[in-house]
């Protein structure tokens, strides 16, 4: 069986933490920022984790399953 290829879009967007959770960036932070408050923009800056429901799908894209 050939080697599995990692999805190149997924490898740019997701990263694994030390505990095995998957880190992701928030959406809505690239343009149309004038109408968003400072607080909204600040909170969108931080990383978040992928929800448990989506974890298996992302792991499959990253060839971790």
From Swiss-Prot:
Signal peptide: none
One Pfam family cited in the UniProt record for this chain: Ribosomal_L35p
UniProt keyword annotations, A-Z: Ribonucleoprotein, Ribosomal protein
Record's GO cellular component terms: cytosolic large ribosomal subunit
Record keyword Ribonucleoprotein present: yes
A molecular-function term among this protein's GO annotations: structural constituent of ribosome
Any single biological process term in GO: translation
Statement: the UniProt record of this protein carries the keyword Ribonucleoprotein: yes
Family: Belongs to the bacterial ribosomal protein bL35 family.
Listed NCBIfam families: rpmI_bact
PANTHER family (UniProt xref): 54S RIBOSOMAL PROTEIN BL35M, LARGE RIBOSOMAL SUBUNIT PROTEIN BL35M
HAMAP family: Ribosomal_bL35
Protein name: Large ribosomal subunit protein bL35
Source organism: Porphyromonas gingivalis (strain ATCC BAA-308 / W83)
